Amino acid sequence: MNIVFFAHPAFLGHQSMPRFAQMLADGMAARGHTVAVWAPEAAFSRLSAPGPLRKWLGYLDQYAAFPAQVRRRLRACPSDTLFVFTDHALGPWVPLVVGRPHAVHCHDFLAQRSALGEIPENPTGWTGRQYQALIRRGYTQARNFISVSRSTAADLQRFLPAPSVRSDVVYNGLNQAFGPQDPGAARVQLAAKTGLPLADGYLLHVGGNQWYKNRRGVLELYSAWRALSAHTWPLLLIGQAPDAALVADHAISPYRADVHFLIQADDALVRQAYAGAQIFLFPSLAEGFGWPIAEAMASGCPVVTTAEAPMTEVADTAGFLIPCRPATGGTAWAADAARTVEQIAALGPEARAQAVAAGLANAQRFTAAHSLAQIEAIYQDIVRTPTAA
């Protein structure tokens, strides 16, 4: 096949989406397909400008300069070229290739739902609502979709004006080599690298400051667990620097001296952190997929996560489930969820080994090779099917 992948521009500084696009491109190239990646380049956005104006200059690169480049490039593309949008948020470009074989990968519709007022925890301003409407007008013209979870696929169908010609679900494959390590050795090495007191064990969260990551809930849960447990393991939060709200919550925590933020950790260190953690906390309010659940399980770490889709799709029966944190009543929620955390903390060696083994077995569902094989078969079917254009 000849495949063109549309990807987010590098100048936006995204991390997970460029990795996903690269995994697709590398995977299809390794399978013998001819691959190209098209993405806007910085021209207007390279100009010196204050922050808000710089964002609008980026829009010029994405929605004025880039479409003109695409129209020129299309003339040289064979008629059987498959055009793949690596994220439905690239929807404004979909009309450029409508009528030709195409596919749209869908990760989560949280921004779309927020723009329609469906998520009170994440209100969206007027310009944000217009931007999401522009995205929706684009991707709803597509006919073939691949979602990362059944939950995402269900949201997609709500937003489409009519049923799509094709809608498949393919779970994400892990795009790094996650695997178990000796936990004690991992902790000692991590403590040496970071200078933090992690050698005797720790609880872990990996994620950014997005509202749905519920980092404030992680702090609440940790404090509630410490209040009832004889264990004094610290909490390690890997991701962005804490925002103002999280800094304020941290400042009033009675266990703040045992809460450590690790900013911009490299991939190798994250893998080591998973392998050494006693328990991985992932109380997200929502997700498109929930990569860290599979990453932690593949690393041999028991996972506590929310009893809501798609977290339940990823964790399956191998996770320890807690209720979703309500908009109010976080203290009561944390006290209840802390009992589940303590249940894991109290496991004996044999029971913990069983929990770890269940997670490792579950994580086998999320190999990159399996995901890429499924995606390749879908791509080939789209190219073979005239009505899929």
Which residue stretches match the model-derived regions?
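Carbohydrate transferase catalytic cores enriched for Leloir-type hexosyltransferases
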Residues: 1-389
